[in-house]
Amino acid sequence: YSAEWAKKLGVDSSNLIYSPAKTINDMVDVAVQLMEAEVDIIVVDSISALLPAIYFEKDGDELKSLQDTKQIGAEAKDMTHAVKMLNYANKKTLLVLISQQRNQFGSMHASHIPTGGMAVKFFSSTVIKLWSSEAEANAIKNGVQVGDKIIEQKVGRPVNWIIDYNKLGPPNLSGQYDFYYQGSQIGVDQTGEVLDVAEMMGIIQRGGSWYTIEEERFQGRAKAIEYLRENLEIVKILKEKIYGKI
């Protein structure tokens, strides 16, 4: 965890409790205590990195030798118990479990499954899948100050999302946002999101590559976003119009 990087992403570290849990058991112990304290949000990053009990000697924290930890389904078994306990203990907390996808062996076709077993999915209210391409063609590039020169570098990438499973509303809703990891803008591009949503709702007109924003015209999405970043009062007006149509 980097407090400096978190701050750039908009995290208020003064209101954050950080616990470096390394095992599924540690995660459950800490999460239950936080739930009992009625903490609003808990984020586990990630359940894929947590070790199951099979990695440790009985009644101790000493790691076993690698050859003694090869038990199929050990992580899924422990995560099944974990989500049951967390579900029972939870009264008002939003619990976000971040996972990673793995290749599924033995399948006729290429397929990916999240770690932690099926219980994680079925105990969840909503499952959102995120993915992004590292291809050069999909990278977001911009000029970055390096010494006394401006050099074009990769500064971000588009991220796709889809609601894969949902107990609270319709599934299969999808979308995309831009994430910046370098340059003057760090994190999710909320300005670009306002532009795209306003266009979809007809608040902003677009013809070909031209955008019309409050009677001002711009060629290209990048120019339109640049204008909005320099005119936050226009962003505020667009947000009010968007909320008025929801």
Segment roles from a protein language model:
Residues 1-81:
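Conserved inter-motif catalytic segment of the P-loop NTP-binding fold
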Residues 4-5, 107-108, 217:
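Short Asp/Glu-rich motifs
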Residues 6, 45, 99, 124, ...:
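Residue-level signature of catalytic and energy-coupling elements of molecular machines
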Residues 16-19, 43, 96, 128-130, ...:
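Short hydrophobic alpha-helical runs that function as membrane-insertion/retention elements
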Residues 72-201:
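Phosphate-binding/switch region of NTP-binding enzymes
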Residues 189-223:
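Long, well-ordered amphipathic alpha-helical subdomains in the mid-to-C-terminal portions
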Residues 209-246:
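Terminal-proximal interaction/regulatory segments of ATP-powered molecular machines
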